[in-house]
Amino acid sequence: ASRLLDQDRIDLVLCFAPSCQVVEGFRSTFAAVLGRRLDGQIGAVGAAYTYQAMEYRDEGFWQLLDDYRVLVVFDEIHHCAGHDPLLSNAWGQQILHRIQDRAAFTLALSGTPWRSDDKAIALARYSSPEGLLICDYRYGLKDAIADCVCRSPRIVLLDNQKVKLTEQLGADSSVKLFPSIAKLLGESPVTYEELLRHDEVINPILDLGCSKLNELRQIKPDAAGLVVATDIEHAQQIALALEAMGEDCRIVTNKTPDAQQVINAFRSSTCSWIIAVGMISEGTDIPRLQVCCYLSRIRTELHYRQVLGRVLRRTGESDVQAWLFMLAEPTLQR
C-alpha cells in the first residue's frame, strides 16, 4: 500500500476482515506504516470494516471504487465463498457484486486457504480440471520461522497405554482396558467430548502446559498460555482446575460482557492464562501467547491451524518455540 501510494497508483485503501479485532489491527498497523489514518473520516487514507458491515454500506460508499483508484485488502478471504453469485455466500456475493471488477488492486489473504464445504473462495483462481488453488504468492511457516517472524511449533500428544473404562450395569460393574485413547474412542461408547470434560484428562494436559509455561516465564516473564475450551461450562471447569494449581487466569467467551476489552486487557497484562470459547481464533493478536492446551471438541484442520497460529508469533530473540498440548485423538493426529 505504501509503495502504491508513493508511486501515485492508488488514492485510497479499503480493508475488510471477519472480526472487529482484525479490523482494529488493520487500522493501527496501516496508520503506523502509512503515517495516515485508516478510520474512514475526512483526511484519512481509507477505512477498515468487517465483512458483515459490507451489506450496510450505501451506494455512495461503493461509488468510491468508481471515482478513485482503490486498493482493497481482504483478510482471511476463505470466509467469502463463490465465483458465481448464485453459489456464493452473503459475503462472497458482496465482493463479486461490489468490488471484483471495480477496485484498482485487490489483495486477498488467507492462512488457511480452503473451505470445509469445498466451495470456491471468492476472487481465487483454480487449476482445471484438478481444481487446485492457484496462489500468486505463498509465505509458509517454514519461511516465517527462517525470517524470525514465527516460532517453531512443538506439538505434544497426550496418550495412555492403560485406559480403564468402568461400566455400571445395575448393581454390577465391568472394567475394560484399552491400550490407547484411539482404541477407547473407536471401541467404546465414550465420545471425544465426554473425554474432554473428564478431570483425569483436563488436569494432566494443564499440568504439562503449566510446567512448560513456568519454564518459559523464567526467560520471558510475560509469556502466557491459551486454553481452548468446548463451551462456557467447560471453560469454568478448566478455570477451577487452573486456580487449584495456583495459576491466575481469565475467561473470554461470546457471552462475556465487553469481551474485546477483556482480550485487550489480557494482551498488555502479565496474567498467565486465558481460557477461550470461540473468541481467540484467527486474527486475534496476543503475541505473548506461547503455550496452548487444546481442549476443544472441534477437530477440523481449519480450526486446529487457526488455534496453533495464536501461539506462533515471535516477539524477540528468546521466544523461538511455541508449544501445543492435546489428546492423541486420531483426527487431530492426522
Language model features with spans:
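Conserved Walker A/P-loop ATP-binding site and its immediately adjacent core
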Residues: 3-32, 230-233
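Conserved helicase motor
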Residues: 19-22, 50-57, 79-82, 229-233, ...
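Inter-Walker segment of RecA-like/P-loop motor cores
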Residues: 30-64
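Loop/turn-to-beta-strand initiation segments
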Residues: 12, 43-46, 68-71, 102-108, ...
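Conserved RecA-like P-loop NTPase helicase motor core
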Residues: 248-334
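Conserved RecA-like helicase motor-core motifs
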Residues: 11-14, 34-47, 239, 243-261
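Interdomain helical connector at the RecA1-RecA2 junction of SF1/SF2 helicase-like NTPases
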Residues: 118-222
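SF2 helicase catalytic motif II
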Residues: 63-108, 112-115
